[in-house]
Amino acid sequence: MDFKKLAAEEIKKNIDLELNFIEGLIEVPPKPEMGDYAFPCFQLAKVLKKAPNIISKELKDKLHSKYFEKIENLGPYVNFFVDKKIFTEYTLKEILLKGDSYGSSDMGEGKNVVVEYSSPNIAKPFHVGHLFSTSIGNALYKMINFQGYNCTRINHLGDWGTQFGKLIAAYNRWCNAEELNRDPIKELLRIYVKFHEEAEKDPSLNEEGRMYFKKLEDGSEEEIKLWKKFKDLSLREFKKVYDLLKVDFDSYAGESFYTDKMDAVVEEIDKKGLLVESNGAKVVLLDEYNIPPCIVKKSDGTTIYATRDLAAAIYRKKTYDFYKSIYVVGLDQSLHFKQVFTTLKLMGKDWADSCKHVGFGLVRFANKKLSTRKGDVIFLEELLNKSVERTLEIINEKNPKLENKEEAAKKIGIGAVIFTYLKNNREKDIVFDWNEMLSFEGETGPYVQYSYARGKSILRKSEEASYDENQIDYSKLGSKEEFELVKILENFNKSIINAINRLEPFIVTRYVIDVAKAFNKFYNAHSIMNAADENIKKARLYLVKCTCQVLKNGLNLMGIEVVEKM
């Protein structure tokens, strides 16, 4: 039951306008005393040739519905006050009926959506910057799937490119075999950083790197063997992190997967008369779009990642026939994706507009931007383990007798990190602050998880007070705090759809924060176990149960596990 739609349907009986148009105009008033929904009459003034205030008064007098306890006009607005009992009963019954699927829908109708995310570079550490893409992508995947789409998760590994020529050159010159066996990623990072340091003094090293990559592209056995070694060592390390995060993928087809598909793409671009030569390189001119040329082949004949992304997009359309293809990649790649998507459009790919770049900001520690070339890297596995350790210290301090402390610390600590990445608009930079991130107060992961655990604790205490959920008296949940909580719980599906439409997972994060805040306001304002009478107690326990279900579902969509006891 959609109460906003019910208000729109009531208005439509009296005004000759499309239902969707009316529904689109309906707002949520800024204050509860102004109603639950408000319909502005400004747009009707020209048609009806009357002042909006008069229209709202005349319209209000014609509106009657059992779903609204009263309908009032206030200036140019018609304000709808839902019937609290009907609204509460419908919402809470719906939550417990659907359980873990509450908030889901069949909006996607099985359409295929591809989400590319995480995509770390082979032979480089999985650092804290990679978790931005991983967290956003995993949350979008879960939310999109939850709304009835068929979603495919792609980890487009950075396993090809001139950096591998540089790494082979560095490996041949400086690699310590013993260190490589002991800690492969750190040793590969060390020699990669050394290469860039030495190349600043001796630029001919860059030429050597290009030469090795050309050999790699030409299929040289020795270079391919080294490249495979780097890849195997890296994937082994990445798996440790993905296991900690409980993140999976349907495909690990990285840049190298498309090496045998690029010639056909370059040929297709050439046949369409789009390819021109510029300083020895092959490019697609995008001047009419005010975009710099898209380089398809460099002057030495090697491809760049634009070529591979063009091949990947075409392959994915052919393989998955996607309705939408989403790329969760840093904001610094915005121009690159504009070039790729515009080139696809010029190639006659009418689906190019279905490709969306979901950019995100930077991760900072002490005002530093992370850079692999300079070695300014904070390894993600270390950060996650540190977060778990710090959380365990807090638990030992606050509740040393807690069962399964290590398991709880793992869920809270890792959840706190993910929550930090998803808390704000994805384009904002993140500055890590341990004290804030692990606080059990304020807008944090531990605060939301604690709210869930508090609710579950209440429910465990009430187990002996069994009751028939079909005999709940919903009129007992009429206080301001109770009804505000119910209204927020009802809004779950809308917040997910809003997050999908805007490709902004933080909308759901802010939503679960709102649920936790409203729940704690209710908890602090009203006694549950010692309520005035048994019917109030049962109704409030029912509300607690529904709140826990919604918090669990919301955290799950963010890739965060709940903790039953804290």
UniProtKB/Swiss-Prot annotation:
GO molecular function list: arginine-tRNA ligase activity; ATP binding
Keyword annotations of the record: Aminoacyl-tRNA synthetase, ATP-binding, Cytoplasm, Ligase, Nucleotide-binding, Protein biosynthesis
Keyword Transmembrane helix: no
Predominant place of localization: cytoplasm
GO CC aspect terms: cytoplasm
Short motif 'HIGH' region, span: 120-130
BP GO annotations: arginyl-tRNA aminoacylation
Transmembrane regions: none
Pfam families found in the cross-reference section: Arg_tRNA_synt_N, DALR_1, tRNA-synt_1d
InterPro entries according to UniProt: aa-tRNA-synth_I_CS (IPR001412), Arg-tRNA-ligase (IPR001278), Arg-tRNA-synth_N (IPR005148), Arg-tRNA-synth_N_sf (IPR036695), ArgRS_core (IPR035684), DALR_anticod-bd (IPR008909), Rossmann-like_a/b/a_fold (IPR014729), tRNAsynth_Ia_anticodon-bd (IPR009080)
Annotated localization: Cytoplasm
Enzyme class, spelled out: ligase
EC number: 6.1.1.19
Catalysed reactions, as listed in the record: tRNA(Arg) + L-arginine + ATP = L-arginyl-tRNA(Arg) + AMP + diphosphate
Family label: Belongs to the class-I aminoacyl-tRNA synthetase family.
PANTHER family for this protein: ARGININE--TRNA LIGASE, CYTOPLASMIC, ARGINYL-TRNA SYNTHETASE
Subunit structure, interactors included: Monomer.
Identification of the protein by name: Arginine--tRNA ligase
Organism of derivation: Clostridium kluyveri (strain ATCC 8527 / DSM 555 / NBRC 12016 / NCIMB 10680 / K1)
